[in-house]
Design a protein with these regions (language model features):
Chain D
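Iron-sulfur-associated redox domains of electron-transfer enzymes in respiratory
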Residues: 1-166
Length: 290, 666, 321, 166
């Protein structure tokens, strides 16, 4: 079986801990050979790019350079990391000036980068490398009756729609259906969750998050399932504020890896189910789980 | 050894003429300098410049000089030989010189128009002139071969273009075979309800022409058939046609359709292609009531008998003319024709390539062709505008330029969408009373009475919003939007983003080349433009001709085109074919190859090289020979003959070697 | 009795095979000897340069010169003979087009000398001494001819009247040439004294050649057991016959060896190698570049194969650098 | 103004695709380098390797051969014959010291006027970088080594004539 390197980024070590726990648990259950990238550093996130382009590329580039020594694909579950690393990869490939500067910087740190690393998203790997067939086989405990609103966020399909449709992504839907869940069809799969605006311009950020939550509820979803730590944080963490500003939605926001894990019969405790601010207990119980 | 001996011999007298082409050439090339330069070259007896060499006085001048100055060779530096070679050959002939003692120099397309530095362009012109003058010395006196033209014509594609071309030719007394891939002729037009801008019913004006084709004594109609092979040359094409099995004997079926009622499937069950899948049909079916020929056919994919061989065959039983034949096989037929008209039509843009418009995701989203059937009295809903969910739309949004004028999909304007969108807007409003919104980039209504039609719709209260729709979504932001499809668009006239809630969205898809356009053009040995439509010989002066003589193109296979233009073009193509046929013969370029028998060692190298089997090996003489009528003059054999025993007229080794030396010698 | 017409034989850069060819006339040579006075024939008789110089210009009816020209001495000799002879016959492939010696045109003079005097395994030359064109020994100046950088055909140095092709020319065409000279029935200047039709015409294997070769690989004679009847090209062997002037009566194919092109091309062809390539490769089977290259790999030394006897007269004459 | 080397390029274009494309480039008023001299043939298959060698021998710095795309030949398969011959010719040119870039085979369809422009511009640029080939000049230089002796011999003749005259 193919080997992979895992790039956690800051979120999966912090606010997105549940994502890391469930992701690694699922990988383990699938028998994937995956190892955390040694001595990785901050990807720079989307903000840094607009401030210090070259430096931000060098920062992200360092991770690519370390990965290249191993000559393995890198899995970046965090959407921001996924986007930034891919953007860097692209910039280093296409812009000779930037490559020159960045590689010089890396050389100073005893590193080099040829540009061979592939940065991939868990969805991509699960669907295209592992395959639905294998996954379905491992579904011991299908989450029957669980109605989910699959929410992809903006970063994994924009600007690079490498493994899914830019307007109507479906890979997560497929996985959730394989897990036994029902998926609502809705048009907001890739609409903005508010991003950093929830912190900087709350009146705008909260509204955007509210739109997603409300629509999901309207479509009869018991929970939103996502793949982005920031989306999860915005949609889950601000529901209190949203309740006071608009209305109470009370919509649990899970990671797709959590649902997958449950369906594969892994204990909720290993999947960080309890870490959610809006408790998923009820819906999951409805889904006949645990 | 004997190299360049000919140079020492006395040179033939060359006349050199350079054309200003108004300022086309003169503005970038110092015509006088080239004329003076040529005058000083060995063998040049006369050197002149003139404003328009191709004009009558220009040609007269040449003819006169040939006589007065006893010119033995002619060189004209002007435009591309593809344009005026023939003109100046005639001028030479007028002066009593064999037309092939002539060489043309292309200093317009290949120099004046493509360079920016007058000095270097002029130098280039000199080099090319010098080369032609060096080469023309070796030219020989040649005659064009005349071959008879077969008066029969093949028309490929039975849309309105093919129908019109076939009828025009047949009315002129020519025997025409019309080959159509589908089970009926009529093409896209047969699927339309009304036609813009006159709103006369498509069926009413088309079906008479369709039946005229069927009943015309001079037309053989082969539907459900495809051309599989084309051999031969202008005036003498041999065409192989494959006729797919209908499993119903065409000559016996009268189209009573009782077999359809009798079919074991009591209800129509399968997507019906003609109705864009909006309607259903049985395994035994006929596309539409006026289908021509009015002959049913059986679909092997869905017919139980053909799939399993286990069916009571009530259809066959119901046919008192015993027309059914489940063992029918595809048959191949051969035709001899002199000319071919290609009118293979177009394909509409695949909306799956524009997922933001939600086709397939939202049942309320339709393609324009689907709506054509929806508003059509003989369509699946008998003309009633009913949505897939059975409801009637109160508001309809029509999105223009889907798959047109778009860097992401197709760059070109599809030319008909604005007008048919207006037509559909009118029809939908008329049939359903719904509010109709048109979302357009620019309104293009350049045809006769088109702009007036646009005015008329403005008067009818159809809404027009200028802007490219960003997305179609069912996400409601306001109560009014609940349960609706919302079109998000920047209104570029009002200058803000609007959300328009509707019940039905119509995607005005653009026109594309047929998916198999490339194979087809290879089969007929013609070209395609970069966007994939068939390439005309000249965009302005030979719009229905191709680079292969005797093969003409008409309609949307050449470029997006509406019905009036298509019919006009079909007429033009038919006229071109007629002028070829009625001449009775074609003159073939004499640029054929021949083998000098006493030089041939009989090594057979050339024999397999000829794609037209023009070269054969004479077992008695043990030498190869070339049939100059079959030879199309590519010269591959001449280049390959290892003992230099094959000559290609107009491209002999001496001619090319001297041209090489000519362009390089300073 | 009037003295017999005088003829001269001379050899330049050649293997001696052409001399052999003259001897191969067998008893016919007696006729020749009887008919003419040989005034120069280094391989067989002892004449000195002074003897020739002493003769009045144009006093020799014909000079037969074989071998390519690659030293200053050869140039002196052929120029001298040009003066003394009425007719110069370029004798054999080397004189006509450089022959085997002209393959040296693929290398620079220096690299050749370096190999021969320094690097060649069988050389013992610790002082790395190279021959000098001039050296003084005990007050006497000794000279050696200069080795030229370009190997030339005879007609690239002096004006030539007739050409006898072949490596070597066959007794038959030699005899015809001699008789023509003696009888004075001479063809136009510059004529190659051999048929203008390619070799296939006279090859016994001709009928066994299929029209469509569609070759998928080329083999070399040592790699296959050669069918003695079948066309050699059809067996995947490079046979230059189709691009080579006839006249030898297909000796090599007769001896179960492919034609290597020693008679040179017909007059209608300027570059034998290029023309042969044009003919044979038009018709190999593959259409994809990679597959085509695979077939071409069967010919490791194209220049040596297609210009074995004619590099001096090829359009490019020698390797550039 | 600095005199930069302007390469001479001989271009053999097939009538149906590449020559037509060059016409199209003209009609579209595309601008490209004036270094190429087009020789029209009906099919790239007419181009005998001898033509390419002769062009170089007569002073071309580069030779361009343009035909229809594989599968699109107006004469069905002429361009495949071209491809096969020219693959071998390219090897021979290399062995004779004429390296890649000086000889180029391009497939340009009748619709690709812009490709005529880009190919000729690109080739002009690359051949300019390679510098002059100038075989005619090289031939002259090569023959310098035999001129001295030739001169002597001729001089020898002159002297004699002088003597006779005296």
């Amino acid at each position: 079986m193919k080997k992979y390197l895992y790039f956690p980024g800051c979120s999966l070590k912090g606010s997105g801990k549940a994502y890391e726990e469930s992701f690694l648990a699922v990988c383990k259950a699938l028998g994937m050979d995956i190892r955390e990238l040694e001595d990785w550093n901050c990807c720079g996130a989307t903000a840094y790019m607009s401030v210090e382009e070259t430096k931000s590329y060098a920062l992200a580039g360092r991770n690519l350079a370390i990965a290249e020594r191993e000559d393995l694909d890198v899995i970046a579950p965090c959407s921001a990391c996924y986007l930034v690393l891919n953007k860097t990869q692209k910039a280093l490939k296409e812009n000779t000036e930037i490559r020159r500067k960045v590689v010089n910087a890396l050389k100073a740190g005893g590193l080099d980068y040829k540009g061979t690393v592939k940065v991939r998203h868990p969805l991509d790997v699960l669907i295209n490398d592992v395959g639905l067939e294998k996954i379905s086989k491992l579904i011991k405990n299908p989450v029957k009756g669980l109605k989910l609103a699959p929410y992809y966020g903006c970063q994994i399909v924009r600007p690079y729609a490498t493994f899914d449709d830019q307007h109507d992504p479906v890979t997560m839907d497929k996985l959730m259906k394989a897990a036994g869940a029902e998926c609502v069809t809705w048009p907001l799969k890739t609409r903005c969750c508010g991003g950093s605006l929830t912190g900087t311009v709350p009146e705008v950020g909260l509204r955007l998050a509210y739109i997603i939550l409300k629509e999901a509820k309207k479509r009869g979803a018991g929970a939103i399932v996502t793949l982005c730590p920031l989306c999860q944080f915005n949609l889950d963490g601000y529901q209190g504020k949203i309740a006071s500003k608009y209305e109470s939605v009370d919509m649990p926001v899970l990671y797709f890896t959590q649902v997958l894990g449950l369906a594969m019969g892994l204990p909720g405790s290993e999947l960080g189910i309890k870490r959610g601010i809006i408790s998923a207990e009820a819906v999951l119980a409805g889904g006949g789980l645990r | 050894m004997t190299e360049n001996k000919s140079k020492k011999e006395t040179l033939p007298r060359v006349g050199f003429y350079i054309c200003h082409c108004g300022s086309n050439i003169a503005s970038m090339i110092d015509v006088l300098e080239v004329q003076k330069y040529a005058a000083a070259l060995p063998g040049v007896a006369v050197s002149r410049e003139y404003k328009y060499m191709c004009s009558d006085p220009g040609q007269e001048m040449i003819a006169k000089d040939i006589k007065e100055h006893k010119l033995e060779r002619l060189v004209v530096a002007a435009c591309s030989p593809n344009l005026h070679e023939e003109t100046f050959r005639k001028a030479a002939a007028k002066g009593g010189l064999n037309p092939f003692f002539f060489q043309m120099v292309n200093i317009r397309e290949h120099a004046a128009w493509v360079h920016e530095d007058k000095k270097s362009a002029t130098e280039k012109a000199k080099d090319l002139a010098r080369a032609a003058i060096a080469r023309v010395r070796f030219h020989k006196s040649l005659d064009k071969k005349r071959v008879a033209v077969d008066p029969n014509v093949l028309v490929v594609g039975g849309g309105i273009a093919g129908i019109h071309a076939a009828l025009t030719l047949a009315n002129a007394g020519k025997k025409v075979t019309l080959v159509e891939r589908e089970a009926t002729i009529g093409g896209h037009m047969a699927a339309f309800d009304k036609t813009f801008p006159t709103l006369d019913c498509a069926a009413c004006i088309l079906t008479p022409k369709m039946s005229a084709v069927k009943s015309h004594p001079n037309i053989t109609l082969w539907t459900y058939s495809e051309v599989s092979k084309v051999e031969g040359y202008v005036g003498n094409y041999k065409v192989t046609v494959t006729r797919k099995p209908r499993f119903v004997k065409e000559d016996l079926c009268v189209g009573c359709m009782e077999c359809i009622d009798a079919c074991v499937f009591k209800e129509p069950k399968f997507k019906d292609k003609f109705n864009q899948g909006l309607g259903k049909r049985k395994p035994v079916y006929i596309d539409f009531p006026q289908a021509t020929p009015k002959v049913v056919l059986v679909d092997p994919e869905t017919c139980i008998q053909l799939k399993t061989g286990k069916c009571k065959q009530p259809c066959a039983a119901a046919c008192d003319r015993k027309a059914f034949d489940f063992n029918q096989k595809a048959e191949t037929k051969e035709l001899q024709v002199g000319a071919i008209v290609l009118s293979t039509g177009f394909k509409t843009y695949d909306v799956a390539r524009s997922p933001q418009y939600g086709y397939g995701r939202y049942p309320g989203v339709y393609t324009a062709l689907e709506v054509e059937r929806l508003v059509n009295a003989s369509g699946p809903t008998s003309g009633e505008v009913v949505l897939r969910d059975g409801t009637h739309p109160k508001a309809v949004g029509i999105i223009h330029c889907v798959g047109s004028r778009d860097a992401k999909t197709n760059k070109w304007c599809s030319r008909v969408c604005c007008m048919y969108s207006l037509k559909l807007a009118h029809l939908i409003k008329e049939h359903s009373g719904a509010e109709v919104y048109n979302f357009y980039i620019d309104m293009r209504a350049p045809g006769k009475a088109y702009e007036e039609f646009y005015d008329k719709l403005l008067g009818e209260g159809v809404h027009f919003i200028r802007g490219r729709v960003d997305e179609v979504t069912d996400w409601a932001m306001t109560p009014e939007e609940e349960g609706k499809l919302v079109l998000r668009v920047e209104d570029t006239l009002a200058g803000f983003v609007r959300r328009i809630p509707v019940d039905m969205v119509v995607l005005s898809t653009g026109l594309e080349p047929q998916p198999d356009a490339q194979e087809v053009r290879r089969r007929f040995n013609i070209g395609c433009g970069s966007e994939g439509f068939f390439q005309e010989r000249h965009p302005k002066l030979a719009p229905v001709n191709t680079f292969t003589d005797g093969i003409y193109i008409a309609g949307a296979c050449q470029a997006p085109r509406d019905i009036p233009d298509t019919v006009a073009q079909a007429g033009a193509a038919a006229a071109e074919a007629l002028s070829l046929i009625d001449a009775g013969f074609v003159e073939l370029e004499p640029n054929t190859s021949h083998i000098v028998e006493e030089e041939c060692s009989g090594c057979k190298t050339c024999v397999p090289l000829c794609p037209y089997s023009a070269i054969t090996f004479d077992e008695a003489k043990k030498k190869a020979t070339i049939n100059e009528v079959l030879c199309k003059g590519c010269g591959v054999c001449a280049a390959a003959c290892p003992s230099g025993s094959i000559r290609q007229n107009l491209f002999e080794d001496d001619e090319i070697f001297s041209e090489i030396e000519g362009v390089l010698a300073k | 009795m009037p003295d017999k017409p005088k003829v001269a034989f001379y050899w330049c850069a050649s293997c001696g095979g052409c001399e052999e060819a003259v001897v191969d006339l067998a008893e016919d040579i007696l006729k020749v000897v009887a008919a003419v006075d040989i005034v120069l024939w280094p391989v067989a008789m002892d004449f000195k340069k002074e003897d020739v110089e002493a003769r009045p210009d144009k006093s020799i009816v014909a000079g037969f010169i074989n071998g390519a020209i690659r030293t200053s001495e050869q140039e002196e000799w052929v120029r001298l003979l040009r003066k003394k002879c009425q007719v110069i016959v370029s004798f054999g492939a080397c004189a006509n087009s450089g022959g085997i010696p002209a393959l040296a045109n693929q290398f620079q003079k220096e690299s050749i000398l370096k190999y021969v005097y320094d690097d060649c395994p069988s050389i013992d030359n610790p002082g790395k001494i190279r021959p000098q064109t001039e050296c003084v020994d005990e007050g006497r100046t000794l000279t050696l001819p200069e080795l030229r950088n370009v190997v030339r055909s005879l007609d690239q140095v002096i004006d030539v009247d007739y050409y006898l092709p072949g490596c070597p020319p066959t007794p038959k065409i030699i005899m015809n040439a001699v008789l023509a000279l003696l009888s004075g029935k001479l063809p136009p200047k510059g004529t190659v004294l051999s048929p203008e039709i390619a070799l296939c015409e006279e090859c016994k294997r001709k009928d066994s050649k299929p029209a469509d070769l569609a070759l998928t690989e080329f083999k070399r004679p040592h790699q296959v057991l050669i069918d003695p009847e079948k066309c050699l090209l059809a067996q995947g062997l490079v046979c230059m016959g189709p691009a080579t002037r006839g006249g030898c009566e297909a000796l090599c194919p007769g001896g179960n060896m492919p034609c290597t092109g020693c008679f040179g091309p017909t007059t209608r062809v300027k570059d034998q190698g290029a023309k042969f390539v044009s003919s044979v490769f038009s018709n190999i089977a593959p259409k994809e570049e990679a597959e085509i290259d695979a077939v071409l790999d069967g010919i490791p030394d194209p220049i040596g194969t297609f210009y074995r006897y004619g590099l001096s007269k090829s359009m490019l004459r020698r390797k550039l650098n | 103004m600095s005199e930069q080397f302007e390469p001479k390029i001989v271009a053999f274009f097939c009538n149906w695709c590449t020559y037509t494309a060059a016409d199209l480039a003209g009609v579209s008023r595309l601008k490209y380098a004036p270094n190429a001299r087009v020789i029209r043939v009906m099919c790239s298959g007419r181009v005998d390797p001898q033509f390419v060698l002769d062009a170089f021998a007569k002073g071309a710095d580069g030779v361009l051969l343009g035909g229809c795309h594989p599968g699109d030949c107006h004469y069905a398969e002429g361009n495949y014959k071209t491809l096969r011959r020219m693959r071998m010719l390219t090897r021979m040119l290399k062995d004779m010291g004429i390296y890649d870039g000086r000889f180029r085979l391009e497939w340009i369809s009748g619709a690709e006027g812009d490709k005529v422009k880009s190919v000729i511009n690109d080739m002009t640029k690359k051949v300019r970088a390679l510098g002059p080939l100038d075989l005619p000049g090289k031939f002259k230089n090569w023959d310098k080594e035999i001129e001295e002796l030739e001169a002597q011999v001729n001089k020898g003749d002159k002297d004699k004539e002088a003597v006779h005259a005296g």
